[in-house]
């Protein structure tokens, strides 16, 4: 099954399920749906960022959260976050804490976004089908990049940065 065959729950502005549609239908018709973003910190407080693969249908080649993905139909947010961490970074058995909810809007491609964070020093092995590269950055480096080159980041990551990351010490 290709990613275009994936089925997502279509939701309303209150994040209540009102139907189902394929990934292609959801994106082509700006239907509200769900996604997760995960911020992976190491024990020194650095944040792992990924650069999205050029083959991605949304924001190819841009820097993004450590891991991210769509919530599949019938799946809950936390299960999706665990699945995406494993699929994209080969991480499992980490404690995930929800830190932010962003309501669906054009900037998020009509996705309600739940943001989770975890702290781990486990080895990260990126999935080259999803991610072209990734690395840990000090928060001061993330801030500098966001100020100098905000266009190299996804629009959703920019919202996460403004509403959560930039408020960290």
Regions found by a protein language model. Name each.
Residues 48-49, 66-98:
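The catalytic Nudix box helix
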Residues 29-31, 58-63, 137-138:
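A short, polar/proline- and glycine-enriched secondary-structure boundary/capping micro-motif
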Residues 38, 67, 98, 116-118:
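A structural signal for short, well-ordered beta-strand segments
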Residues 2-37, 43:
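Acidic, metal-coordinating catalytic segment for phosphate/diphosphate chemistry
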Residues 52-54, 83, 135:
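Short, cationic motifs built from Arg/Lys/His that form the positively charged side of catalytic pockets
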Residues 35-67:
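A glycine-rich, hydrophobic loop/mini-helix early in the fold
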Residues 24, 61, 73, 100, ...:
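Nudix hydrolase/Nudix homology domain
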């Amino acid at each position: 099954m290709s990613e275009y065959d994936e089925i997502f729950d279509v939701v309303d502005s209150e994040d209540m399920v009102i139907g189902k549609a394929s990934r292609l239908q959801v994106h082509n018709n700006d239907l509200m749906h769900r996604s997760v973003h995960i911020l992976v910190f190491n024990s020194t407080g650095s944040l792992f960022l990924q650069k999205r693969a050029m083959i991605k249908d949304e924001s190819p080649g841009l820097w993004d959260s450590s891991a991210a993905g769509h919530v599949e139909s019938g799946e809950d947010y936390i299960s999706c976050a665990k699945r995406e961490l494993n699929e994209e970074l080969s991480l499992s058995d980490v404690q995930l804490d929800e830190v932010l909810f962003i309501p669906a809007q054009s900037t998020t491609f009509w996705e309600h976004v739940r943001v989770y964070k975890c702290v781990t020093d486990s080895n990260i092995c990126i999935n080259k089908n999803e991610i072209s590269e990734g690395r840990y950055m000090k928060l001061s480096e993330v801030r500098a990049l966001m100020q100098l080159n905000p266009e190299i980041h996804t629009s959703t990551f920019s919202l996460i940065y403004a509403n959560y990351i930039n408020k960290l010490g």
